[in-house]
Structure formats: C-alpha cells, structure tokens
Amino acid sequence: MKKILFLIPNLAHGGAERVLVNLANNLDRCKYDVTVQTLFDVGVNRQYLQPHVRYIPGAKKQFRGNTMLMKVFSPERLYRYIVREKYDILVSYLEGPTSRILAGCHDAGVKKAAWIHIELPTPKQAAIGFRTPKEALRLYDTYDRLVAVAASVRQVFTDALPVHTPIDVLYNTNETEKITALAKQEPDDPMFPNGGIRICSVAKLMPTKGYDRLLNAHKRLLDEGLMHSIYIIGIGEEQKPLESQAVKLGVEKSFHMIGFRDNPYQYVSRCDLYVCSSRREGFSTAVTEALIVGTPVVSTDCSGARELLGEHDEYGLIVENSEEGIYQGMKRMLSDPALLAHYKQQAALRGKRFSREQTVQAVERMLDSL
C-alpha cells in the first residue's frame, strides 16, 4: 500500500478544496493510505473528509502575509518543519506555497506531483508562492509529474514557465451520485422564492469571478424588459462592494447574494440558467456541477470552458470574456425559450462525462505510473 500526502493551504469553500476532498475520499483504500494535511486548519470542507482519510491540521488561524513569510525560508527547511512523516508520494494540490514546500523533499524513492488549477499567464503569476520565476522553474523541475485541470491551463502554464517535468491533464473529481441526490432536495429558503426566471452562480466572491460585470449585464437586461432574478451562492471579500454596486444600480431586490450553502445543488438544479462570469478560471467545478444537475450554462471564454461546453457550443453557450459578452449570452438565452430547453437537455448529456469513477481512475493511473 502506498502512503500518499496531499498538502494544501486550507480546506475552505473553494472549488479546488472541494475536489481534493472528493478525490481523497474516493481513492482506492486498498491501494492507498491517504493523508490530507493543511497549512492552516480552517475551512468548511474539513467536515466532508471520510473517516478513512487521515487529516493533519496546520496552524489554527490563517494570517495575512503568510506566503511572504514562507519565502524567507528554504524549501528544505519548510519541508522538514511541516512534513514530519515519511510518504511514498507527495502531492501539492494547489499551485503556490505548498508546491515550493514539497520541492524541499530530496528523499530517495519519494515521488512528487503538483496540481495547477488556474491559468497563470505570466512568469510572475506562474511563480506564485516562489521567490522568483527562476526559482519556480528550478523547483518545479524537481517534480516527477505536474497535473493541470484543463488542457488550456497546461498550455498557458508552459508558455509562462517552460518546465521539463511532464504535465498530465486530469479533470476534477466530482461526487456525481451525491450531487444528483442532493439536487432533488427541496430548498426551504425564504431567500429563494418560487416564480419567475431564476439565474444562479456559485463561487467565492472575489474579483476574478466577474460578478461586477454580471451585475451590469443584469441591469441592462432588466431595463430591456427581460425580467429575471439572480442568486449568487458564496461568500468572500467582494460581498460589500457588490452590495453597494447593486444598490447604486437599483437592482438590490433582484440580485440576491444568499451566502454559503451546504447544498448548493438544490438551488442550481431549480434555476433556469447558470452563468459563469469569471475573468479567469481553471476547470470550473461549479460549471461541471451545473451540467451534472442539468442546468443550462452561459460561460465566459475562460480556461476549461471549451472542454466543458464544447468547441462549438454543443453543450452550453461560451461568450466573449467581457461584460458585453455576458450580456449578449444571457440575452440570447432569455429571449429564446427553445434554446434554453435545448441546452437543458445538452447539459444533462454532458454532465454524464464527468463521472466520479472515470476521474478517480485517471488519477490512480497517474499515481501508479510515478
């Protein structure tokens, strides 16, 4: 049995954190002894780890400037301080500090892999968590395998940082059966009333998610008489700025930020449309989940969108990555009920491709090949 360590900054409410929990829970427990370790013991996704997955918590509180502080120390010193046990395979599951930390392991026979979840288009961005792009290139080349969550993520990364380490493309693991079952539960939520056209999006409230653009598109569509309500499921730093923007636009009664929900699927499955307004993505977990529950999708042309929705909009509508693109895509869907019905069928069809079994088996093949 191989001992595997997955190292990640925390298990907060983001997509990468959620799919790590899904993956750790579903790896073959007869083949792998799985440990998940965090740098900081925070995040709602901790509770979803199954009992057979060992969890090693980090510091109790996450503090500002921690990434800069870790750059002061060498990877070797950080590794010796943070990782106290011996493993057969070390996995950094998020680009950044954890990739630098695990690069400090030089033990004979230990294999290393690192995941890249988002587009990192410049050398500086590709070197996030490292002192310099030169250091990042040197340390990434100590890994046995890198993993990108989409082909476009791999291409952007290698353009920015020409590593020699092989890079596999492995899609995120989703609990498809669990998602489908949870989607059938009826939400009892006064913040989510029945009636009218309902549009949703699920994400951390942060600038890269583009909700400021979605708000402006929402206002324009309402002014044209295309009535609908938008529900944003998530929390984050942009909540107050978005609330202020909604009030300024006069749409605070139709643009609802309902916060974090343990079961977002019961909301997404009952919405007429899912919108990904992101400026930048990796391989959107939330869009994947929308497809699994059969909700039509409009997405900006960001990383992973074409792998999810098709090169020619076969399974969803991909639009220009701009406020105008979001507006035009939503307008097209809201103006054409037949098109919306078509993409509802196509979403359910596409969702079947991202089954838990297929994605887990692909990761296991990669681990076994190291």
Task: Report residues per predicted region.
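Nucleotide-activated donor-binding/catalytic signature segment of Leloir-type glycosyltransferases, i.e.
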Residues: 243-259
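Short hydrophobic beta-strand element within catalytic cores of glycosyltransferases
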Residues: 296-299
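A short, active-site helix/loop in glycosyltransferases that binds the activated sugar's phosphate group
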Residues: 100-102, 141-168, 174-178
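A conserved mid-protein helix/loop that constitutes part of the nucleotide-sugar donor-binding site
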Residues: 17-22, 197-220, 226, 237-243
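N-terminal strand-loop element at the rim of the active site
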Residues: 6-14, 18-22, 26-69, 167-169
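Short His-centered aromatic/hydrophobic patch
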Residues: 92-98, 116
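Aromatic "clamp/platform" in nucleotide-sugar-dependent glycosyltransferases that forms part
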Residues: 260, 279
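Conserved acidic donor-binding segment of nucleotide-sugar-dependent glycosyltransferases
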Residues: 311-323, 332-337
